[in-house]
């Protein structure tokens, strides 16, 4: 616990400016996005769906950027510190704490900008207020993407390689979200392990997308009820947990590897 | 620290063979050698990050402080902060003693004038001194420095090595420095010359005092040692095999005595 606190203290002493930088960047991205897609949102089905999808991708991008930018900016001395005196579990838990905080701040910013641009019912499904429901969903999406980025950082050694991989991750999230077209078979199974799918379902349910459909039409994926939203949140939480644990395990093996 | 590596293979091909050498306490040893002779591989064997056939004894893995060629530092920290955090995480010092120890190592490494400067504003030599201070303050008994003077001018390099050698003697540490810089050879207590044989395998061509090295290699200038052992296609005279054999028989004679 002492190492954990000291690591956070050390991080804050030199990296706190990252918090501000990332938050400003998030605010800028979400503002531009909301401005671009604001027409007919919460009035027409397709406009709302496009808006939610755009905001979802913004959150995924911000999450990925948080961890990848941070990890590669400190990679060299961090691996040296981990080799010498910083226990892997301390680093993984401290990093999770930092990213948790960063994602929380960014989601509040996202939810604030989102509520400024769009007029939607204030009654929430889980938190009592719909802005808060959106905020929690933004948070889970951002943190989930963040942990995915962290896992990628463990798997890929160079910043050049990760820059090649990021578009692949983003495109696969984009395709597997289920927003652009219906998925079947293997694609459907693969989609179940993506942040985009569960984030999009949660956002669509909170926005009550089904109520914007023409009479007689109903999609089975958006259910504006607390149980279904919790179901989507649980999946996002599970993805966060899996990526965090895998990152820790990968890092442990990386640090204790003996080459032949 | 006693190294006895019978063989180290990379993809089935021998990279090191018959490496028997002692690194005594209180002495600074220079490991010098030709390119591809296996200096870095030898270090990896010593710090336990690669497997090999043989033994490295009379040491504890936890006692090793490894100083990399390129300082691994948080460039946003000041020199003092970098040393402070290293000391803090080592958990060796009480809260009261911590500041005094940081101060001591800042003085030892001659960093007083730049202690409050961010590391990104320091020169290569100053960054390397911070990196060394970070390791020294952790109180480890074995210091392994990997080409820490690469890219530094001769004066800075000499100052760095001189400081490290003097700390080694004063604090009774075992220091092993890999370097291509042969001009500082007289500062060390011992020298190990690692060469690449004609079969492209690393072997020892000399291990002993720097005072006798010129007569062993039959040269007047230290630089000529490397000229003699370097391969012909690298501009040398390709006599590595001869000196490996010469040293093996020299060691055998010493053993009998």
Which sequence ranges carry the predicted segments?
Chain B
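Topological signature of polytopic alpha-helical transporters
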Residues: 1-4, 11-12, 101, 115, ...
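ABC ATPase C-loop
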Residues: 135-136
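The feature captures the beta-strand-to-loop junction immediately N-terminal to the Walker
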Residues: 32-34
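Walker B catalytic motif
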Residues: 147-149
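Q-loop/switch helix immediately C-terminal to the Walker
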Residues: 70, 75-92, 101
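Conserved ABC ATPase signature
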Residues: 118-122
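Helix-to-loop junction immediately C-terminal to a conserved catalytic motif
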Residues: 47
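Conserved ABC ATPase "signature" region
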Residues: 97-114
């Amino acid at each position: 616990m002492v190492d954990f606190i000291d690591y956070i203290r050390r991080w804050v002493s030199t990296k706190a400016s990252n918090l501000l930088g990332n938050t400003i960047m998030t605010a800028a991205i979400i503002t531009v996005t909301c401005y671009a897609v604001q027409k007919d949102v919460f009035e027409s089905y397709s406009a709302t769906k496009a808006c939610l999808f755009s905001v979802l991708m913004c959150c995924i991008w911000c999450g990925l950027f948080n961890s990848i930018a941070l990890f590669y900016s400190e990679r060299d001395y961090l691996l040296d510190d981990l080799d010498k005196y910083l226990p892997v579990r301390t680093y993984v838990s401290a990093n999770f704490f930092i990213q948790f905080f960063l994602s929380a701040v960014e989601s509040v910013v996202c939810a604030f900008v989102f509520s400024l641009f769009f007029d939607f019912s204030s009654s929430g499904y889980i938190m009592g207020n719909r802005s808060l429901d959106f905020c929690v969903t933004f948070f889970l999406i951002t943190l989930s993407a963040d942990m995915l980025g962290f896992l990628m950082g463990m798997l890929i050694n160079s910043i050049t390689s990760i820059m090649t991989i990021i578009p692949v991750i983003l495109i696969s999230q984009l395709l597997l979200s289920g927003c652009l077209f219906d998925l079947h078979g293997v694609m459907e199974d693969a989609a179940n392990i993506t942040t985009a799918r569960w984030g999009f379902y949660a956002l669509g349910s909170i926005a009550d997308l089904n109520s914007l459909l023409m009479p007689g039409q109903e999609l089975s994926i958006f259910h504006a009820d607390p149980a279904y939203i919790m179901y989507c949140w649980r999946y996002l939480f599970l993805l966060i947990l899996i990526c965090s644990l895998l990152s820790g395990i990968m890092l442990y093996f990386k640090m204790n590897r003996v080459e032949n | 620290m006693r190294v006895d590596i019978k063989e180290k293979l990379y993809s089935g091909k021998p990279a090191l063979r018959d490496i028997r050498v002692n690194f005594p306490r209180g002495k600074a040893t220079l490991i010098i050698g030709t390119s591809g002779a296996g200096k870095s591989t030898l270090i990896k064997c010593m710090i336990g990050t690669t497997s090999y056939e043989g033994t490295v004894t009379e040491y504890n893995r936890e006692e090793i402080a490894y100083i990399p060629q390129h300082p691994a530092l948080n460039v946003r920290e000041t020199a003092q902060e970098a040393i402070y955090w290293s000391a803090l995480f080592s958990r060796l010092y009480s809260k009261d003693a911590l500041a005094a120890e940081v101060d001591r190592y800042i003085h030892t490494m001659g960093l007083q004038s730049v202690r409050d400067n961010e590391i990104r504003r320091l020169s290569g030599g100053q960054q390397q001194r911070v990196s060394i201070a970070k390791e020294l303050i952790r109180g480890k008994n074995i210091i392994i420095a990997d080409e820490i003077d690469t890219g530094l001018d001769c004066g800075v390099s000499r100052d760095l090595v001189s400081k490290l050698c003097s700390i080694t003697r004063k604090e009774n540490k075992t220091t092993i420095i890999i370097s291509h810089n042969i001009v500082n050879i007289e500062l060390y207590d011992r020298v190990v010359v690692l060469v690449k044989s004609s079969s492209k395998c690393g072997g020892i061509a000399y291990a002993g005092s720097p005072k006798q090295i010129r007569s062993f290699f039959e040269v007047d200038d230290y630089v000529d040692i490397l000229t003699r052992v370097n391969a012909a296609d690298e501009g040398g005279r390709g006599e590595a095999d001869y000196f490996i054999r010469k040293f093996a028989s020299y060691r055998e004679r010493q053993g009998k005595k």
